[in-house]
Amino acid sequence: MQSQLLINGQLVTGQGALLPVYNPATGEVVVQVAEASAEQVDQAVLAADAAFEHWGQTTPKERAEHLLKLADLIDSHAETFARLESINCGKPYHCVLNDELPGVADVFRFFAGASRCLSGLAAGEYLAGHTSMIRRDPLGVVASIAPWNYPLMMAAWKLAPALAAGNCVVLKPSEQTPLTTFKLAELAAGLFPPGVLNVLFGRGASVGDRLTGHNKVRMVSLTGSIATGEHIIGHTASGIKRTHMELGGKAPVLVFDDADLQQVVEGIRSFGFYNAGQDCTAACRIYAQKGIYPQLVKALGEAIGSLKIGPPIDASSELGPLITAQHLERVVGFVERAKALPHVQVVTGGERVNGPGYYFQPTLLAGARQEDEIVQREVFGPVVTVTPFDDEAQVLAWANESDYGLASSLWTRDVGRAHRLSARLQYGCTWVNTHFMLVSEMPHGGQKLSGYGKDMSMYGLEDYTAIRHVMFKH
């Protein structure tokens, strides 16, 4: 099993402390991996900085060819990636292979094409005897920090636009889920020029802080928690680095009386519980208009109760475990505090699963109120709440009354209502009569405490560039 770092084109063993990497389905240690030392962090950044002198001057066509080759390698090693992600994250193998891996390769292919379409603007003459033009140029070294819930996909979301724009990258996966990133490093080592892509491993305090604070790093891109985002913004403030933050979420799902009940139930069953609910866009905060509320709660309870929890290798498993024992206890705490409220009804689930691994039952809590902790805070587990509402004005206010602003959805047959509300929901993405759907061509990113900056799309590519004005006198 590949567990080495990638520094300046070479796979090397970390020189820091040994850290265990667990299989959350069993609680067993899969492998022990050595962190990068402080010297290795510096080596990776300096290698990226040196490589930028050449990589930043390559043509979009050259960069696109590298990204397309990497996409092909991901496709040809898809089963290996899926197996590693399943072991390390506890996800059902078939979900990773069929749902995630095609999207990972597609992101690299999209940005390969997008890089060839990125251009500045020839602006014209705004001062007599002078011609101005606008350039979009790469920034330099980008430090990318990926999360544990989608380690390979988030690595792709960060690497593809940064490399396509002409930057060099030092990527640090979560210390809990590095295995697919190590495999990606192995493939990239023989593909990219030395230093263009570097992969480190370690904890935030020992590796992440040194990486993000390095004076040669021009931009830091994070997908992670709000607390981690706050820390990195503060830690990098003295260096005035550009930051790109995709942080937490608590997606409101607005269900009106005229919604298609079956579509809503099927959508929440899928989109509220994918990856055991460990997703910033999970359909977890349901608001149901009072006319449809009783039927929705009943139908949802039956649908969610039918979800199959099981070993990741089992083709019939729909939910795997939570990522760590600590995170399981966090989810248990949220649910226990909610269950203690007299107005909250446990429709289904609500308990941990006995046995090995960090499993929690898919859970539906009805009658939760707007002010309840379970409604206001991100649980990041297989837990969905349903709250009844009266009318558009009330539910719009409740949906926007949140510190989060990443994703939302509304379910109605009324086109006018859909347009009215989608224009006023304070979220980076709003789906109508669906949820969770992402494509490489469209941007993904948040507002408020959910962060700023966009992943995917041409907007994502532009985020990794500097706008420059060049003026000619003639």
Swiss-Prot record:
Species assigned in the record: Serratia proteamaculans (strain 568)
Pathway: Amine and polyamine degradation; putrescine degradation; 4-aminobutanoate from 4-aminobutanal: step 1/1; Amino-acid degradation
A GO molecular-function descriptor: NAD binding
Binding residue positions for NAD(+): A146, P147, W148, K172, P173, S174, E175, D209, S225, I226, A227, T228, C280
Keywords from the UniProt entry: NAD, Oxidoreductase
CDD domains the record matches: ALDH_ABALDH-YdcW (cd07092)
Residue numbers annotated as active site: E246, C280 (nucleophile)
Subunit structure: Homotetramer.
Protein name in UniProt: Gamma-aminobutyraldehyde dehydrogenase
